[in-house]
């Protein structure tokens, strides 16, 4: 491994992420209990009064809250519509996340596209620039078909929840080459005709494979 690659890998390990994993066939209280037992804290409780979404939460040994929330897009009985929402994670937490998913699966959780389930990964913005995000958008646009095939995404999910990079956004992004995050945000919303309510959680620009 050359020095440049080594440095890139070390920098990648500093990246913060948040992960959301949708599943069914397990109720949220049961999932939270499994997590609390895995963490060795035994601490889990109903936090819907604070978090909404019929949430149950579990806490790890670092005091971080892992949430299990209701997501209506998941198939099955309402009591078993379960979305794991992690706290902010780093590379060091990957084995913990993987083992938790294994424990949940052993407890009965199921997750695949036929159940209306997906995975969302939120990347921390720290360290990124308009240029790195433009590079990311272009890389994603050139590999989306491979990702869709590998994940066996059906046409409905691609057209509704996992839309490909909007060609209007990509064209303006590469033509204007924004130098500030504010300019990048303007291109993202205006190119897709979603500048109204851009601070709203359910803005119409969401539900792409890549969301900025």
Regions found by a protein language model. Give the residues of each.
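Active-site beta-strand/loop microenvironment that shapes enzyme catalytic pockets
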Residues: 121-123
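Short, conserved phosphate-binding/catalytic loop or strand-edge motifs used
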Residues: 115-119
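C-terminal accessory/tail domains of diverse enzymes
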Residues: 1-113, 126-212
